[in-house]
Amino acid sequence: KMKEGGLPYNYSELADELLAVSHRPYGTGFYYGDARQSPDVDGYTAECRHAATVEACEPAGEGAFRVIARCYNRFCEGDELEALSPGPHIPLVRVRNLAWLPAPDGDDAQPKRVPVAVANRSAERYAFETGEELAPGDFLRMRINVER
């Protein structure tokens, strides 16, 4: 298979992505006696957590970009997030100047951004600055420690 530009895919680069998917540990199920799906681990295994999805990105000065993203799992000021994008490979993205963007309501039609240290409101919008240009739809994730 070829990717854009006629270059062959390097499948070894994609191999780690298979391990990053959240799933229950594999087991023998009913094959050997009582059914046990995951005797050693309770719950799912994952090496990455979906932190946010990019909704917009615009220039914010020389070498800086302002990102608007919808939060799915907690991330913090200073965290380094991995960006998964159908476009060019993007290195780690460091979160700077994190702010919560409250939704308008009956009391405040144009609420001001609120500087925060932690993005912890699931499905809410946040803004931050970074040195990398992102695109709407880019998936931001963070690596987590998983014992196996």
Segment roles from a protein language model:
Residues 1-148:
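Surface-exposed amphipathic alpha-helical tracts and adjacent flexible/coil segments at the periphery
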